[in-house]
Amino acid sequence: MEALLKWSAAVLAAAVSFLYGEWTILLSILLTLVVIDYGTGLVAAGVTGNINSRVGLIGITRKVFIFVMVAIAHMIDTVLLEVGIETEALIFMAAVVFYIVNELISIFENAGRMGLPVPKQLKQAISILKGDESK
């Protein structure tokens, strides 16, 4: 059993290394925000009476695909490096930061759906980040 546990940990570490390069603090932040967003989304759906398992499954699928997209961004950086184009993980970092901002926006929207007051300036910033500056 102990050997299986060690083997499983080694396989997981190799997979993470292949998919994301090294695990960075930005990935830890993204993972944390993904979990918080999913949790706040569940609570907001419960408060508004819109909770259902199909929507929850779609939410989990979307969260998984965030990490698929980040892995693809890392692979693009790796391919570019292999052909002599040094990106310094620019595509990977851009993807991670994009999804971090997206998760933050969603968390604040969930807070509003739960009835938690969201400061006007924060609402304006979210509108700008979403590309809807008219609000």
Curated annotation (Swiss-Prot):
Topology within the bilayer: Multi-pass membrane protein
Signal sequence range: none
One of the record's GO cellular component terms: plasma membrane
Main location: membrane
UniProt cross-references to Pfam families, sorted A to Z: Phage_holin_4_1 (PF05105)
Coiled-coil segments: none
Keywords of the record: Cell membrane, Membrane, Transmembrane, Transmembrane helix
InterPro entries: Phage_holin_4_1 (IPR006480)
Localization (cell): Cell membrane
Transmembrane domains' residue ranges: 7-25, 29-51, 64-85, 89-108
Similarity comment text for this entry: Belongs to the bacteriophage holin family. Cp-1 holin subfamily.
Protein's name in the database: Uncharacterized protein BH0965
Organism whose genome encodes this protein: Halalkalibacterium halodurans (strain ATCC BAA-125 / DSM 18197 / FERM 7344 / JCM 9153 / C-125)
